[in-house]
Structures are given as structure tokens and as C-alpha cells.
Amino acid sequence: MRASLLAFSLAAAVAGGQQAGTLTAKRHPSLTWQKCTRGGCPTLNTTMVLDANWRWTHATSGSTKCYTGNKWQATLCPDGKSCAANCALDGADYTGTYGITGSGWSLTLQFVTDNVGARAYLMADDTQYQMLELLNQELWFDVDMSNIPCGLNGALYLSAMDADGGMRKYPTNKAGAKYATGYCDAQCPRDLKYINGIANVEGWTPSTNDANGIGDHGSCCSEMDIWEANKVSTAFTPHPCTTIEQHMCEGDSCGGTYSDDRYGVLCDADGCDFNSYRMGNTTFYGEGKTVDTSSKFTVVTQFIKDSAGDLAEIKAFYVQNGKVIENSQSNVDGVSGNSITQSFCKSQKTAFGDIDDFNKKGGLKQMGKALAQAMVLVMSIWDDHAANMLWLDSTYPVPKVPGAYRGSGPTTSGVPAEVDANAPNSKVAFSNIKFGHLGISPFSGGSSGTPPSNPSSSASPTSSTAKPSSTSTASNPSGTGAAHWAQCGGIGFSGPTTCPEPYTCAKDHDIYSQCV
């Protein structure tokens, strides 16, 4: 992410801790999702967990806060190790305090409740994050961006966090994934209250415009931004790191948002982004545009490897109102294509005069290693105290330079105090999350790993009627109707529409129903 997610106001219950508290009940919101294979898409009923930095932390002996405003409590936290021993991280009122609501297949994140913003992770069980291995796979989900204005970011992305939140590696971390510890990303955020089982007390400098601050240390790891967006602009961006998994950095060597040298030793903070507006198509994404953000749509992202097994291409396309919409083509001189490849990234950096830290940190090949190794799924809603989200939806930097036009938002937009006051009811809803091998989604045209009309072959943004294909190899025991897991309906479908007992034809989208 361009700026660390925690660079914004946290109005209540903010701090970190590494002991496990018991004063507030721990009830994670539920989320149903699917992992698909050629044999079908079994349903997984799991939960989401709120990041540790948002939680109330208090003395293990009582309810005295370890962190108030944007300062550590001096008696409890004279140094990092003492603070970790003295402070407990507690449960959360997900809906009332943090605006996180899970309902079946959907998770909604509201921007302002008693708190401002939120970040949550998909769980495998009560003590482990769900780890997704997405190299040569595709992931798709529905999203409603209609209530996310300019200046906000409703994001879904991957982080190479430890599955247990760092408990095994760092014995002083007693809270672990159950309390959502161990966050990291390619910005190497230094505003995290706890890193590697100790408090980030040393060198802590309180922020001048929010309830955070920065310490001497940051937490780095590879990051894949699948979806960063509001109803004005969107971008998808790989961020490789030379060391894939979570690791701690120190001072300006961290790079990223909070360091004097943005281009640190470990991670590519800028990444290689595909933002349709930035790439010259100003009519592709937004309210009333080709991808119309006034209503819900599906995002499909494919991570395609080459014959050597390395990540070679990241493709994205969309589905709305029964149509597959290919990603827009670049209209920038010297940059071609509508997907992220190594050549696209090199050409883009040259055309815009950007520092090519992406290639220096290993490029797509290094990003592919992280995807193969498995990453944690993250969902968030946030505003940006570092750059007012201009890097996503406005002109950035100012004055104008090549590649600075990123969205139609005014350069005066995104000021957190104004966004908080004027758009408190903003929310993003992610739903119907699924992943599996290339071609498994009903929108991607079978095993080829591309949508029915190849995005790379189109000279301009187009849309076409979807051609869903059955991925089932199951047989139909009764000899009539569709087989178990096979397609049984959808726009343009002419096959059997009944299912053998005890299965029923369940609608997944307007263009696809399946015997389940």
C-alpha cells in the first residue's frame, strides 16, 4: 500500500500488546468462502480477526491503558521488553466499536463508528491465519464501492505474515493470530505498536495529526495489493521484498512512508501499479463508467506463471450485470498492455521517470515466490494522513509530472479530518470470495487462464457477454440433468438446468448457477 494503513485517526481503543487479555469477550465475525478445484467448490466457514493495533491494551494486573492518545504509559512501558511483559491485548466489540460485520458470505467494514477505519485478516482456525498459495491461481470476489468516496481506500490484499502471528518465532508474543499480531507489508510500517514480540517504544515519536506515531523499528514483508480502490479510482500493485517473510527493520533503512529515504534496503514501497486512469483511460472505472462503481461488481485476478515456474503476469478483469469486462489497455506512449508483466513495469517506470525499485527488489519473479510460499488475506478501510490518498485518486505528486494523473479527485481532497467529518457512514462490502486454479472461475473461459475475450488482444476497453464453462469432471449418476458441481444455469447457458437428488441448482451469479 502506498502509505501505511495506520497513518490515520484512531479515535478509540487504540494500542498494541503481546499478552492475551480476558476483560473483553473475543467474538470474531464469521465469513464463508470457497476454495475451488475441478471437483467443485467446498464451502469453508471461517472468521475474520481485527488487527492488534486497533485493540485495547491494558496492564495485565488490571485495566490501566498501556497506550493513551499517542503516547506510551511510562511506568508500564519504560522499554520494549518490559512493555510486552506488562501489557495484555484484549478482545473487541467488532460491530459497535470497529464497524466490522460478518454475515454469511459477506464482510462489511464501516469507516467511522466509535473508531476510525479497520483492518482484519482471514482465519483458518482460532489460532492460525488462513494461508493462500496463489501462484498460478486466480481469486475472485464481489465488491460494493458505492459508499467509498474520494480520499478513502477499501482494500483487499495479501501480506506474507506468519501463520501464527509470530508466536513460534518470538516467545514474548503470547497473543498471536488469535489477537491478530504480526502485521507487515512492503511499506515496512513503523507505526506498529508491537513488532517481533516487543513494544516499539524506543524512539517513539507521537504523530502531530492522529493517535499514532512512529518508532525506531518497522515490520517488512512482501505485499500483493489485489484491490485498492474507492468509487473514483482503483489500482492493483505487486510489492516484492528481497526477504519474503516478515522481518524487522530499523530507522531509515526501512524505507516506505515513514523514512527519509523511501527506497529502503528490503522492500519496494512503490510497487508496479496498474491504475487505468494513470495509464490514460479516464472513462474505464467510476460512477457511470465502463466498470460502474454505483453498483456491485466482481473482481477476478489471475497470477500466471511461465514454463520456468516463475510469476510472469498478473491479470485483472471484471464482471458486472452479466458481462465480462476486460481491463483497460494502456494509452501511455511507450507502454503497452492491460496486465502487469516485467516488460510493462520496466516501460512504465521509464515513461513516468519513476525509480525502478521494483526490478531492484526482484520484480515479478520475487513476487511469485511470495505467492507460492503463501500469504494472508487482508481487508481494510482507511484514510491517509501521509498523502491524503492523492496517490490513488487525484494528481500526485504536485506539481504535475508524467504519471501524476491518477484519478479525478481534486488535489485538495482526502484531508482526513474532512473525510472523517463528511463521510462517516462510508463502508465497503466484500463478498463471495473464492479462489482456485487458473480457469476455475465461471468467468475466465476455462483452463486458459484468461477471460473469454483475451484482455491482451484488445486495443481498447470492451465488454462481452460472459461464456461460463463447467469445470466439473463429475459424472451424473442418474444420467439426466447436470452433474454434481456442474453448471446448471445462467445467462446464455443452454445446458441441463436440473440436478440429480439430493442436489439443487444454486445461483452463484447472473451468468452462473451450479449443482450443489
Curated annotation (Swiss-Prot):
It is found in: Secreted. It catalyses: Hydrolysis of (1->4)-beta-D-glucosidic linkages in cellulose and cellotetraose, releasing cellobiose from the non-reducing ends of the chains. CDD domains: GH7_CBH_EG. It is an enzyme of class 3 (hydrolase). Residues 446-480 are annotated as: Linker. The keyword Metal-binding does not apply. The keyword Hydrolase applies. Disulfide bonds join C488-C505, C499-C515. Residues 480-516 form the CBM1 domain. Pfam families: CBM_1, Glyco_hydro_7. The active site is at E223, E228. InterPro entries: CBD_sf, Cellulose-bd_dom_fun, ConA-like_dom_sf, Glyco_hydro_7, Glyco_hydro_7_sf. GO terms for biological process: cellulose catabolic process. Residues 449-481 have a biased composition (Low complexity). GO terms for molecular function: cellulose 1,4-beta-cellobiosidase activity; cellulose binding. Its EC number is 3.2.1.91. Belongs to the glycosyl hydrolase 7 (cellulase C) family. PANTHER family: 1,4-BETA-D-GLUCAN CELLOBIOHYDROLASE B, GLYCOSIDE HYDROLASE FAMILY 7 PROTEIN. This is Exoglucanase 1. It comes from Neurospora crassa (strain ATCC 24698 / 74-OR23-1A / CBS 708.71 / DSM 1257 / FGSC 987). The gene is cbh-1.
